[in-house]
Amino acid sequence: MDKISGFSDDELLVKILSFLPFKFAITTSVLSKQWKFLWMRVPKLEYDEDSMYSFEYSFRYFLPKAKEVDSETYSIVSESGHRMRSFIEKNLPLHSSPVIESLRLKFFTEVFQPEDIKLWVEIAVSRCAQELSVDFFPKEKHNALLPRNLYTCKSLVTLKLRNNILVDVPHVFSLPSLKILHLERVTYGDGESLQRLLSNCSVLEDLVVELDTGDNVRKLDVIIPSLLSLSFGMSRYCAYEGYRIDTPSLKYFKLTDLSKTFSGLIENMPKLEEANITARHNFKKLLELVTSVKRLSLNIENNDAEALTAIYGDDIVFNELEHLNFHIHNAYWSELLYWLLKASPKLQNLEFDEQCSRDGTMGTLAVFWNQPNSVPQCLLSTLQTFEWSGYPGSVQGKDLATYILRKSRQLKIATISIGYGLDPQQKLKMEMDVKFSFRASPTCKRVFY
């Protein structure tokens, strides 16, 4: 009660409104004269064009080319966009909150122009903004240039930019409070803009960088002692020459490297606890970097059977690994998974998403799950949950599920999906084969879907 008594009636109402989605806070203006302008004092603003339409209209407008959009959809989306733009244009400059704690903008129609984005961000920065989030994705692909005052905003803690944003970092700038920086598929003013930005964020803790074709970045060094979380991604056609990552305080690392050749140097991550790796090349080198993690998500996108054989060996052991989420776009997955199980003696949770199957073409790289040479230690002592999303009709996957049930002494629950699109009778037969197989753990619950 003491905290509440410190507020006036209006201040308390504004505080309550700040916990509502902004569009609902605006609607309270019709309640009474007292409420009419209260929303104008809410310090957290969000203008999301998606929220104005049903999913059907957004999908019909955004997916096709502009000339293919039917007149009804175009009219509805365009009129709604104009109303929102007019509303922001009229009310944002007059917003009476002395500090704009956060401004979130998300637009995708040609109604909104790059100049609008620049002006509205400039207003927020002038009000000591702490959080800015801008997602601008018009069909005409015009980039919005951010205002210069953004790069000297001392109050800014969080900056999230997506899609058609031009990040042109000046040679002299200061963002002393910036802790969270997300840059997803944006364009940079020159090849050094991103490097300048990262090299001068001394308290940064959370960084997301997604590079894409035509973004002007060729090389990048991520050397940030304060960084705790890093998500770094490159598209398949990214014209990229190389990167270096040196982050001694990092606890979470996500890497998506779909480039044609691996050209990265990753080092110095002694405190890493969780890793999410999606890659096409150099799997062993990447796995050597994450042997200390407790949680690992591994997504291998490579159809070459021989590319997997270089991974196996006794020199990699995941002594702390408790949770493994394994996705693979390669039919030759069985030996790799068997090796991962052997290399993870403390594994408690296994999720396996089988993307390919090669039943009928078994070769030397296959593991016949009904007769492996030895049982991985984790199955005998620690594995508690198992989830398998199977490739439709995969006998290899069914044999894996049966093997896990037969050998895992501490298993508590097994969640099994045989695969979509399978003949109902064939699916039922596979389910019965798994359901009536022997269980090393008599209390294990099996869930089929």
Swiss-Prot record:
Coiled coil: none annotated. The keyword Ribonucleoprotein does not apply. Gene3D superfamilies: Ribonuclease Inhibitor. Keywords: Leucine-rich repeat, Repeat. Residues 368-418 form the FBD domain. Transmembrane segments: none annotated. LRR repeats lie at residues 27-52, 81-107, 158-185, 186-211, 252-279, 328-354. The keyword Repeat applies. It comes from the Eukaryota. Residues 2-50 form the F-box domain. Disulfide bonds: none annotated. This is Putative F-box/FBD/LRR-repeat protein At5g62970.
